[in-house]
């Protein structure tokens, strides 16, 4: 009989946020798979729990994924945790969940802290519709392409960012979204020095030109303004090929340009791809 994989959310700063169910899962586990075993060991030691640990992260997920699946198939119950917060959100836990599903292994979640959601509800920005965008690329071109893809989205956007990248990211957001977009910069969530800075992108750039970013950030960015229904569709007067070529000229890859043009026209990507390459 197969074991079960438990996705356990762990505190994002305050150890008092650990749930009774999380501790129960730790105590009942045959093995705990952790993104950083040293960090998880500190958590276990705090609660006087002694369990075997194995690492599972972006750089070993393929071999460790197969290893964990083999243990689950032999009836072992395994807990998966990330460094902090909920696993499988913008981390390699997503791949392990897929492997379990492919192998008919039960997966369950033990809910708890999620930095993005906590930052969102503190931001003061609309929460009815939002999109989690995760970490932006360290590559400037890829980062700008990502921002271009979402600049016209009307829902609130959630990003994770490291302190050493924050200034470059804000600069790219200013160029792509405009400096008057509202943003909330949330750091040190649930900790003593928790901070929420609510301002515009321009104001954030001015602030961090004089203050060094510290700690991991969640950036909550206001969505684009709704387009008036009476406004003429700017894409009606150009062909799909011209539409895609426009985005390519702005620096997008052909794949991303086709995806963006399809979204603009509310068409399937495959239809836009076929039309763009027709006659080649």
Question: Where are the predicted features?
Answer:
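Conserved helicase motor
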Residues: 54-62, 136-139
């Amino acid at each position: 009989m197969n074991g079960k994989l438990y996705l356990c959310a762990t505190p994002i700063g305050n150890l008092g946020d650990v749930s009774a169910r999380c501790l129960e899962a730790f105590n009942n586990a045959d093995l705990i798979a952790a993104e950083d075993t040293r960090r998880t060991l500190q958590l276990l030691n705090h609660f006087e729990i002694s369990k075997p640990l194995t690492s599972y992260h972006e750089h070993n997920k393929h071999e460790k994924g197969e290893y964990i699946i083999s243990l689950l198939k032999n009836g072992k119950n395994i807990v998966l945790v990330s460094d902090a917060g909920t696993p499988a959100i913008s981390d390699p836990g997503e791949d392990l969940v897929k492997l379990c599903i492919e192998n008919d292994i039960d997966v369950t979640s033990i809910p708890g802290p999620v930095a993005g959601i906590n930052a969102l509800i503190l931001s003061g920005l609309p929460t009815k519709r939002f999109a989690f965008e995760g970490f932006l690329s360290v590559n400037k071109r890829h980062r700008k392409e990502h921002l271009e893809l979402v600049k016209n989205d009307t829902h609130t956007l959630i990003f994770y960012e490291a302190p050493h990248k924050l200034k470059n990211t804000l600069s790219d957001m200013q160029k792509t979204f405009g400096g008057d977009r509202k943003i909330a910069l949330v750091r040190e969530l649930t900790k003593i020095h928790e901070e929420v800075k609510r301002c515009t992108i321009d104001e954030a750039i001015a602030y961090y030109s004089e203050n060094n970013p510290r700690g991991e950030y969640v950036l909550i960015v206001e969505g684009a303004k709704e387009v008036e229904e009476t406004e003429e569709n700017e894409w009606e007067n150009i062909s799909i090929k011209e539409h895609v070529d426009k985005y390519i000229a702005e620096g997008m890859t052909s794949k991303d340009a086709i995806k963006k043009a399809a979204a603009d026209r509310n068409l399937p990507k495959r239809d836009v791809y076929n039309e763009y390459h027709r006659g080649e």
